[in-house]
Amino acid sequence: LKDPNGRGIIALYLSLLEESDAAALAARVVRAWIAQDTYVGSAMADKGLLAFAVGMDDGELAGLVRAYMRDNPGRRAQFDALVRALCANGRDRALQVLLGVARRHKMAGVQATAAALAREIASERGWSDEELADRTVPTAGFDGDGLLRLSYGDREFTGRLTSDFKIEVSDGAGRTRKSLPPARSGEDAEVVRAAKKRLSAARKEAKEVLTLQSERLYEAMCASRTWPAAEWRELLAGHPLVGRLVTRLIWTATPPEGGPLTFRPTEDGALIGADDAVVELEPHAVVSLAHRARLTDEEAAAWREHLVDYGVEPLFDQLSAAVPRVAKGQTEMRDLQGHMTDTFALRGTALKRGYKRGEVLDAGTFDAYVKDFAALGLTAVLGFTGSWVPEDKMVCATTSLTFTRRGRPVPLDRVPPVLLAECRADYAALAALGPYDPDWEVSASP
């Protein structure tokens, strides 16, 4: 019982059972392993029991793994086993957790393992890593028309996503409800419980999709990723959940001939420009996320006005961060060094912008917050004067912005312009926390 990958003999044996029985058995074994390993215990000697995860409901497995990683932050060996179990399960919700770890995790070894497993699955299916992420986004039970259909037997209910990704329920008469009603006399209690369970799971899953896909679309913008028009329509605009996020972003279509066109999808499926004119998406065009780095001042201003006029809350800012000028071969920015703040304020801003604590040095200090951009193989590094672990509130100052690839410095002129602009904005956000102090090196020593 050493291998948590159950895609061999365990999967074969589970396939001999009724699907519901196999899922129940698998869940019982995996839950027992986690219970034994939680807090003071360790079940690593029997990690092969996680092979049963191959037969679990992927949503249940995803929830268990997320909770374990959140509540047991230092268990690297267990994390390694769990990501292998996610890989073996191979269904959408399990893979989304695997892909999330592959994109960003505080343990580099666990992140590397997850990334390698994700590449393995993508290769098996004939997809790129990014295609795998696109094609495995859960729908939370919503149909292609954007509706969640729930049944009590004779009574039918419909769930619709609100703008903040909550689910609003309506009955057959169109009356809106916050939740599903209790069963009536004569209605099957099991059917009612199943509908309520489905709604609860859908609400949780929709919230997870909002968080994970917002992050992924932001990284796609930073990486200047492109989609063939047909794939963009199918996998993004046509997805019942991601499609709602797509309407809160500005896109660029570049046809084989001619210049790029910027547009925004509306909730009724139309594509419109900043001037409200309909934009035709050519079949052979490539689509990418727009950014201030590739827009004129006039275009950016027009889109700002458009978003206000339509009452659209952008999923994230595409129109503010400008590309800084850098010299050839320059490897760091230091023009915003010496801005004074405290370690808690700096930490809060860095974490909010997607960064995590950098490597802890031998003396128990750290002096950077880092953010990985896996698709580009780059890590952004926001330097500061440092703090101790465990942390206390103390004076600190900003120092630098750098980028690394596999631990080595990367010249700034080789960083994609959009990524450079966005990380420069992160650097500026830290500097904005406090004024410049000409004696910062003395004032902010850790």
Language model: regions and residue ranges:
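Non-catalytic terminal/accessory regions
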Residues: 1-90, 95-96, 102-446
